[in-house]
Amino acid sequence: MNVYLVGGAVRDSLLGLPVTEKDWVVVGATPKEMEANGFRPVGKDFPVFLHPKTQEEYALARTERKSGHGYGGFTFHAASTVSLEEDLIRRDLTINAMAQARGGEIIDPFNGRVDLKARLLRHVSPAFAEDPLRVLRVARFAARYHWLGFQVADDTLMLMKQLSDSGELGYLVAERVWKETSRALMERDPQVFFQVLHRCGALHALFPELAALDGVPQPEQHHPEVDTLLHQFLCLKQAARLGLSLNARYALLCHDLGKGKTPKEEWPRHIAHEIRSARLSKKVSKRLKVPKEAATLATLVAEFHTHSHRALELKPATVWKLFKSLDILRRPERLTDFLGACEADARGRTSFENREYPQASYLQGAADAARQVDIQALQAQGHEGPALGEAIEQARIDAIATFKQQELNP
């Protein structure tokens, strides 16, 4: 029995990055031998075990063969006779197909170290094209390591294009697409994930509403970058810069989808794009089975982001209607996410990257003022039933009005 550290731990160690997770491959062992040594079996499709002390995953070396469509369309074969190289060749990228022996020796049959040095994301073998999920994985790695200068190798991008054109991406289940997308959204350069998907044709297959924004112009006065898809990419870059939550980043992804439905004769203006964007965001969220709160925020940001941009112009009653839509009294964190997404939208424009966004602090302050209304005092004045509700609402609007006056006339 020989045990090797494999995959991401080896890759990140060679890059000088922190290793957060360790995966191991065991060559020359059987499931019975693993269990006899105290390992607990957890794999459903192939033999994977948890170490009795560290709880790290140990998988028996295995091969795989294409037997159907999609990510799950593979037959696996694990046996004590499977070699380390046979196990490594089934992996997606050369930089993920390295192993480290107990003594520290690096086993690198597919020149992963060469590609690490060249900053290339390159497929291990033509079998790469058998698994459509790898299109998303490569795009995610491109987003993760963009800051180090990594690029997708030309021949790998060609295989990704073939996969996108083949229709195989259509067999990916929604949960897998969302899992890869949500992970990519939280990377250091999330926009790169979608740029790579766009380059290989996968954006049109998986996110047609986003792909439809390519070439759609916006008013240059407000959007010096003009192109709406480029604006989306710039927004995601700002989202990472601002350290926004996953929910806020997903909301940004959906906030301008309605511009793809604007009649060409109306370009570059996009009247009522907010309503169209909200409708499309619901469609995307349903298709990808996006978690409820992320989906809700996406719809709200799509519908109300221009309210945030015009916050200082809005009447106090309109601001309170916005707050009610956001349900700020019960979900204060939603306002934080909403404003973060709106700020990234405002900054996600060529030459606007470092602009201040006073609307965020103004709306937070207005929300605080509305929350501080003394309901007991209103009850003491004799308000009750529906009249109490009306009095509370008017008091919140008045509190926002007072705050606005203080902000505009300090």
From Swiss-Prot:
GO molecular function, one term: ATP binding
Enzyme Commission number, as recorded: 2.7.7.72, 3.1.3.-, 3.1.4.-
Annotated residues for binding of CTP: G8, R11, R91, R137, R140
SUPFAM superfamilies, per database record: Nucleotidyltransferase, Poly A polymerase C-terminal region-like
One example of a Gene Ontology biological process annotation: RNA repair
NCBIfam families reported in the protein's UniProt record: PRK10885.1 (NF008137)
Catalytic reactions on record: a tRNA precursor + 2 CTP + ATP = a tRNA with a 3' CCA end + 3 diphosphate; a tRNA with a 3' CCA end + 2 CTP + ATP = a tRNA with a 3' CCACCA end + 3 diphosphate
Free-text comment on this protein's domains from its UniProt entry: Comprises two domains: an N-terminal domain containing the nucleotidyltransferase activity and a C-terminal HD domain associated with both phosphodiesterase and phosphatase activities.
Gene (name only): cca
UniProt xrefs under Gene3D superfamilies: Beta Polymerase, domain 2, cca-adding enzyme, domain 2
InterPro entries xrefs: CCA_bact (IPR012006), HD/PDEase_dom (IPR003607), HD_domain (IPR006674), NT_sf (IPR043519), PolA_pol_head_dom (IPR002646), PolyA_RNA-bd (IPR032828), tRNA_CCA-adding_enzyme (IPR050124)
Protein name: Multifunctional CCA protein
Purpose: Catalyzes the addition and repair of the essential 3'-terminal CCA sequence in tRNAs without using a nucleic acid template. Adds these three nucleotides in the order of C, C, and A to the tRNA nucleotide-73, using CTP and ATP as substrates and producing inorganic pyrophosphate. tRNA 3'-terminal CCA addition is required both for tRNA processing and repair. Also involved in tRNA surveillance by mediating tandem CCA addition to generate a CCACCA at the 3' terminus of unstable tRNAs. While stable tRNAs receive only 3'-terminal CCA, unstable tRNAs are marked with CCACCA and rapidly degraded.
UniProt binding sites for ATP: G8, R11, R91, R137, R140
Superkingdom: Bacteria
Note accompanying the cofactor annotation: Magnesium is required for nucleotidyltransferase activity.
Oligomer status and interactors: Monomer. Can also form homodimers and oligomers.
Reported cofactor(s): Mg(2+); Ni(2+)
HD domain ranges (all copies): 228-329
Additional facts recorded: A single active site specifically recognizes both ATP and CTP and is responsible for their addition.
Alphabetized UniProt keyword annotations: ATP-binding, Hydrolase, Magnesium, Metal-binding, Multifunctional enzyme, Nickel, Nucleotide-binding, Nucleotidyltransferase, RNA repair, RNA-binding, Transferase, tRNA processing
Positions contributing to Mg(2+) binding: E21, D23
Family of the protein in this entry: Belongs to the tRNA nucleotidyltransferase/poly(A) polymerase family. Bacterial CCA-adding enzyme type 1 subfamily.
